[in-house]
Regions:
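Sec-dependent signal peptide recognition
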Residues: 1-8
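Short, exposed beta-strand-loop hairpins at the edges of beta-sheets
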Residues: 83-106
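Sec/Tat signal peptide C-region and signal peptidase I cleavage site
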Residues: 14-21
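Central antiparallel beta-sheet cores of small beta-barrel/beta-sandwich binding domains
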Residues: 22-85
């Protein structure tokens, strides 16, 4: 029984460290100058605004690794959710949100 517990604990630590080392995790500056935090959640990553008028609101959920991610992003002002993608390039997070994969908008957020 103790051996199973030890193995489970080691696997949990390895899984948590894999997410901790992912380049997407951290604080990013939005185009409006607010702080957005990206952290591991539910087997993927969540984007939560930490400052500004929508502070505390989760605005995105993404899955992926090695600098390429896909998921959903929410415009907090319009409260509309879009298909999105994220890509890390150095200390920049390039985001794209699309309606029907036809009409897309992009933003680039620098790492803080």
């Amino acid at each position: 029984m103790m051996r199973i517990f030890t193995i489970a604990a080691i696997l949990t630590l390895v899984a948590n460290n894999a997410h901790a080392d992912d380049p997407i995790v951290g604080n990013w500056k939005t185009e409006l100058g607010d702080t957005a935090a990206i952290a591991s959640c539910g087997g993927g990553y969540c984007i939560t605004l930490k400052s500004g008028k929508h502070a505390g609101k989760q605005i995105g959920t993404f899955h992926g690794r090695d600098g390429e991610y896909a998921g959903k992003i929410t415009d907090p002002d319009a409260n509309k959710t879009y298909d999105g993608s994220l890509a890390i390039s150095g200390n920049a997070l390039k985001m794209k949100g699309c309606v029907l994969k036809i009409v897309c908008e992009s933003q680039t957020w620098p790492r803080m």
